[in-house]
Amino acid sequence: MSKSTNVSYERVELFENPKVPIEVEDEILEKYAESSLDHDMTVNELPRFFKDLQLEPTIWKLVRNEDVIIEGTDVIDFTKLVRCTCQLLILMNNLTVIDDLWSMLIRNCGRDVDFPQVALRDHVLSVKDLQKISNLIGADQSSGTIEMISCATDGKRLFMTYLDFGCVLGKLGYLKM
């Protein structure tokens, strides 16, 4: 794991706006063009797009529409789609790391026992779950539980998904780029 000792703006920016290899961008563009040849690509076409690129379904199904659309529409924004797809590729290349750390969080807050039928990557962590983990490790309650979720979700939700968690790890430098 390539852990950095401090988080720099450059590190966060590298994950938020990854450098896209030309061959990857070409393949994304090709699949996008196939989906939008005679019309604008919409969110309804995302599943097929991601399947055509052979991306991991348990990851891409967590992508939120608002992260890839032109605001106020259901039309896909190509720039956002490229960024999102590249981030998904980074996450897919680091599934073992993300799975191990996510599993540890799920176990330590008790969600694995409370919701045994839920697949690992389908769990969500709430503020309450993170507070349980903070108590378990003896961290001060004011240690930023809400701030952590707010950072992971850009302040949009009070729970964190597997995808959110993977993105936080990427921003912190725990994932191989």
Swiss-Prot record:
Cellular component, GO annotation: nucleus
Q: What's one GO BP annotation on this UniProt entry?
A: nucleotide-excision repair
Cellular compartments annotated: Nucleus
Major subcellular location class: nucleus
Task: Spell out which residues are annotated as carrying N-acetylserine.
Answer: 2
Disulfide feature? none
Do you know which InterPro entries this protein is assigned to?
Rad33 (IPR014841)
Keyword Transcription regulation assigned: no
Q: Where are the residues linked by the Glycyl lysine isopeptide (Lys-Gly) (interchain with G-Cter in ubiquitin) cross-link? A: 19
Task: Recite the UniProt keywords alphabetically.
Answer: Acetylation, DNA damage, DNA repair, Isopeptide bond, Nucleus, Ubl conjugation
- Is Nucleus one of the keywords? yes
Function field: Involved in nucleotide excision repair (NER) of damaged DNA. Required for the repair of RNA polymerase I-transcribed rDNA and RNA polymerase II-transcribed DNA regions. May have a role in stabilizing the DNA repair proteins RAD4 and RAD34.
In the UniProt entry for this protein, what further remark is given in the free-text comments? Present with 1080 molecules/cell in log phase SD medium.
Q: What is this protein called?
A: DNA repair protein RAD33
**Taxonomic source organism:** Saccharomyces cerevisiae (strain ATCC 204508 / S288c)
Q: Which gene encodes it?
A: RAD33
